[in-house]
């Protein structure tokens, strides 16, 4: 019966063990990891890190145990030396006491070993559990052993002090003995502190080296991952993203600039072609007046007066065009001479610092514009010349900047390759690593300085491009102003053709002020100059005043009154957002008064 019952119990235990084995297997089911995914790599890295941490803890534990053993041996040697000194000093009657004291001090604490009681064989799971419990018990025993070692050290120190005191009492006939013992203790304590500090510094160095190794290993892993990604995605280049975007942005700006130049060139060609056709038609009209006479006589019998009036108008228009062309040629020649003089005066300074020369020329043009001594046509011609000169210079600068950037990129790549080879050498020969463990950091610092320098150069280049765009924008504004002036002249000519001359004659006969050219609504960019122009006639000459939002504006630096015959201007050298609003020009004489208003809109500058 006993055998049967024992067999039944064994079967039940085996069944219970199978259930216990099955339950954790169900709970901790094996999930295959995708080796190619990022999650699988992170899991592998985590497992690798945990294994390294466990190895480090085991090495640290072994090192501490060895250090404790060395300290114990040192203490034993010091106690033995101390006993020999006491024996030499006493020589009589104290040998037994000193030996007993030394024996008491030489007691060593041995950690209790965990004895296993013999018994019956158990299952592998029970053995694993017992091993786990044994590990925890072993760690607790080690902690207890370290605590006991610490207490033992304190007890030894106290016993040394007590022995010194008893020896001082016994040997009172030796003056200065107590002081010498305290000095020795103080020396030992300082030496221990020094050793502890050295050990702490050594430990920190080891930790820093390990962290540096881990960081370098992570960097190598990241580079390997980047190389794998490069093989999968050939177009993806890590580290070049910013440069590629900047190159794309530069190309986009160059394309826009090229398109704008082509558009302006096409517009100028169209204007030239239209002007040539108009001149050709005018020449044909002058060569064959008889044809027009016959046509007009056939269509209109009383048309002689109309033909004569048209001929007079054509003659006037031709004379005005010839006069304007001659004035334009004369102004162009004068401006060429002025520009040549400026170039001769600037000389070598312009060659050494082209950008500074352009800015000075630009400032001079602004001063001339503010003083009101030149018109928009002069500004346009000068800006065209400056643009023709500056395009080549800007292109040269862009090419130089690109060459510099390429050289910097090549240097950075070479240094990175050198650093990578140095890291390989360090991995192969770890003895050299301990001599200079922070070479990679120094190279990274130099690389960061180069990147900062390249960023500053890129910022300078962007500022120069913005200056060029600003000059182009101002040139466009001048073109728009000239176009507006041309339209105004055409409207005036149209009004003359439609018979508005009779109204002008009536206004001039009355003598009251009358605006030939009234104010018009304008818009200007913030901080740019603006000019309000009117043409006023009257007999006697009217007095002109300018008003802003119902308040009179006095002539000064901020608001400049300009008068040229019948043309009156209000010039603002610089505009602000608060300058936007309603402006009025008022003309008064003894025959009457007249006023013209407009609205100024200030637009914000996007540059």
Swiss-Prot record:
Q: Which residues form a coiled coil?
A: none
Record key words, sorted: Actin-binding, Cell junction, Cytoplasm, Cytoskeleton, Immunoglobulin domain, Phosphoprotein
The keyword Phosphoprotein is annotated on this UniProt entry: yes
Q: Where is this region: Disordered?
A: 1-143, 165-268, 419-444, 480-514
Modification Phosphothreonine occurs at: 301, 502
A GO term for molecular function:
structural constituent of muscle
Q: Which PROSITE patterns match?
A: IG_LIKE
Ig-like domain segment(s): 513-601
Where in the sequence does UniProt note compositional bias of the Basic and acidic residues kind? 1-14, 40-85, 120-143, 167-221, 228-268
Primary localisation category: cytoplasm
The source's superkingdom equals Eukaryota
Q: Which residues carry this modification: Phosphoserine?
A: 16, 172, 281, 288, 296, 495, 500
Localization, UniProt: Cytoplasm, Cytoskeleton; Cell junction, Adherens junction; Cytoplasm, Myofibril, Sarcomere, Z line
An individual GO BP term = regulation of cell migration
The task this protein performs is described as: Involved in regulating cell migration through association with the actin cytoskeleton. Has an essential role in the maintenance of Z line and sarcomere integrity.
Write down the PANTHER family for this protein, in alphabetical order: MITOGUARDIN, MITOGUARDIN 2
| Subunit text | Interacts with F-actin.
Q: What is this protein called?
A: Nexilin
Phylogenetic lineage:
Eukaryota, Metazoa, Chordata, Craniata, Vertebrata
Q: Which gene encodes it?
A: Nexn
């Amino acid at each position: 019966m006993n055998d049967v019952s024992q067999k039944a119990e064994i079967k039940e235990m085996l069944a219970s063990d199978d259930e216990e084995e099955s339950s954790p297997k169900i709970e901790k089911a094996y999930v295959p990891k995708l080796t190619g995914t990022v999650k699988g790599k992170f899991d592998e890295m985590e497992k690798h890190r945990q294994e390294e941490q466990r190895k480090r803890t085991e090495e640290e534990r072994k090192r501490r145990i060895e250090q404790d053993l060395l300290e114990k041996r040192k203490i034993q040697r010091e106690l033995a030396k101390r006993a020999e000194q006491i024996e030499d000093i006493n020589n009589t009657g104290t040998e037994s006491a000193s030996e007993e004291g030394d024996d008491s001090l030489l007691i060593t604490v041995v950690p209790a070993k965990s004895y296993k009681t013999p018994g019956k064989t158990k299952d592998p799971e029970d053995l694993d559990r017992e091993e786990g419990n044994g590990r925890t018990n072993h760690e607790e025993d080690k902690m207890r052993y370290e605590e006991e070692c610490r207490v033992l050290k304190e007890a030894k120190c106290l016993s040394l002090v007590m022995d010194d005191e008893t020896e001082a009492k016994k040997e009172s006939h030796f003056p200065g003995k107590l002081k010498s013992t305290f000095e020795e203790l103080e020396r030992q304590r300082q030496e221990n502190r020094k050793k502890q500090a050295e050990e702490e510094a050594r430990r920190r160095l080891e930790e820093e080296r390990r962290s540096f190794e881990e960081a370098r290993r992570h960097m190598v892993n990241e580079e390997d991952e980047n190389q794998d990604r490069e093989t999968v995605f050939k177009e993806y280049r890590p580290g070049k993203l910013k440069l590629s975007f900047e190159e794309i942005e530069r190309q986009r700006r160059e394309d826009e600039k090229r398109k704008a130049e082509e558009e302006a060139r096409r517009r100028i060609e169209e204007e030239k072609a239209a002007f040539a056709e108009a001149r050709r038609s005018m020449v044909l009209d002058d060569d064959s007046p008889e044809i027009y006479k016959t046509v007009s006589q056939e269509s209109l019998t009383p048309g002689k007066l109309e033909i004569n009036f048209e001929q007079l108008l054509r003659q006037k228009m031709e004379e005005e065009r010839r006069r304007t062309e001659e004035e334009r040629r004369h102004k162009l020649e004068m401006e060429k001479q002025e520009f040549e003089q400026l170039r001769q005066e600037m000389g070598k300074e312009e060659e050494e610092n082209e950008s500074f020369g352009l800015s000075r020329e630009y400032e001079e043009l602004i001063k001339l514009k503010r003083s009101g001594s030149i018109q928009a046509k002069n500004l346009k011609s000068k800006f065209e010349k400056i643009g023709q000169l500056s395009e080549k210079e800007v292109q040269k600068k862009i090419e130089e900047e690109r060459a510099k950037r390429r050289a910097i990129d090549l240097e950075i790549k070479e240094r990175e390759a050198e650093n990578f080879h140095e890291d390989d050498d360090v991995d192969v020969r770890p003895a050299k690593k301990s001599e200079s463990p922070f070479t990679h950091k120094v190279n990274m610092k130099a690389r960061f300085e180069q990147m900062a320098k390249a960023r500053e150069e890129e910022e300078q280049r962007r500022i120069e491009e913005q200056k060029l765009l600003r000059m182009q924008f101002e040139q466009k504004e001048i073109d728009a102003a000239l176009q507006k002036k041309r339209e105004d002249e055409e409207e005036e000519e149209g009004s003359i053709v439609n018979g508005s001359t009779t109204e002008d004659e009536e206004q001039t006969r009355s003598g009251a002020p009358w605006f030939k050219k009234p104010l018009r609504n304008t818009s200007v960019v913030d901080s740019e100059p603006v000019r309000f122009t009117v043409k006023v006639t009257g007999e006697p000459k009217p007095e002109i005043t300018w008003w802003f939002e119902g308040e009179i504006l006095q002539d000064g630096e901020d608001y400049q009154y300009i008068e040229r015959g019948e043309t009156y201007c209000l010039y603002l050298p610089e505009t602000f957002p608060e300058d936007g609003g309603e402006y009025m020009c008022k003309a008064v004489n003894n025959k009457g008064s007249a006023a013209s208003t407009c609205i100024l809109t200030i637009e914000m500058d996007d540059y």
